[in-house]
Amino acid sequence: MTPFETFWPETFRHAKQHSPFYREQFRDISDAPRLEELQTVDKTILSARNSDFLSVPRERIAEIVTTSGTTGKPLLWMLTESDVDRLALNEQISFECAGVTPRDTVLVAVSLDRCFIAGLAYWQGLRKLGCTVVRVGASSAMLVLEMIERVRPTVIVGVPSFLRVIADKAAELKFDLKNCPVKKAVCIGEPIRDVKFVLNKSGQAIEAAWGAKVYSTYGVTELANSLCECDAGMGGHLHDQQLHLEILDDAGKPVAPGETGEVVATTFGVEAMPLIRYRTGDCAAMLYEPCRCGRTSPRLGPIIGRKNQKLKLKGTSLFPSTLQAVLEECVGVESFAIVARAENELSDSVEVLYHGDAAVAGLGEAMQARAKILPKIRHASREEIEALQLPSRDGGARKRRTFVDLR
């Protein structure tokens, strides 16, 4: 039997019996049906009926986390003790995929506060793997450098933009980061590869500054699951005993293997808040051929964008990530924001604001060459761009955004 055939019937039974939302959805269905016969759910439904997805008594909840709030109000997400164990096992498998072993000392440069699931997950998974774990957090580049000098970690986990901040601080202090013991950088929360699996500017900068190999990951709070790539760097390996993924087109139909569509997930083994056919809103492709590392599990390719962020511009559809890649590669662009507004039913209005000494004409040529379109481009102050990237400093979104959707 396949993992899906093994775990799907129990997932369906548990959700139907214990989740108010799924009890209502499945009231006319007795046995586990074909998955594609069921309706999908998205974050709008989760937000409107958050508590109706709880499938255990409240006293069994061991942890409460929240989503990042990047695309809306943060959701409350709950885990039982068993769910936390599942989370730890998932991360153990992911770190093993990246070649991390019990002999490694791992610096976790990720927040463990503000109800953030990732820091909790990495700490639990690394402990389960048997590593020495240093929870340094993400508040101070100087502290990270001090701990690198004192504990000599071999692996670091962090958001790519923060790893670059650390590298800049090291250069300022003439700290020899490239020859420090860190040989692996597990990157979370931001892309480091393009759709062709080539390292983007951020990934290249981290490898150059740290002298370490970078590993891309993909995770979603609501799934309490993440995927990590192996040394081949050709997609995150799926843990198919914990998660089933579909890739669907705009009509909700499966795309052909290797084609891009929306990532739709069904969780296995979750007690508190199981999800069935959850539309993540992320767009990517699945690869099914065996990996060069020898694993035969399916792999999820780089996320090319959010489905609801797709832009329509002068008869062309594209994701903001295409423009972001151009801006990241242009010498002289220090920071930027892409602002989308509704123009009419057939087209959006897109304005690119950047700070730095790059020429507007050069940026325009690069965008026409890569994206086949020429949006409005304007030089802006660092403060104006910062205000767009971080609109709220009190609560709300935790991530710096470079795409601002005002449609």
Please state what every model-predicted region is.
Residues 67-68, 106, 126, 245:
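Hydrophobic alpha-helical segments that mediate membrane insertion or helix-helix packing
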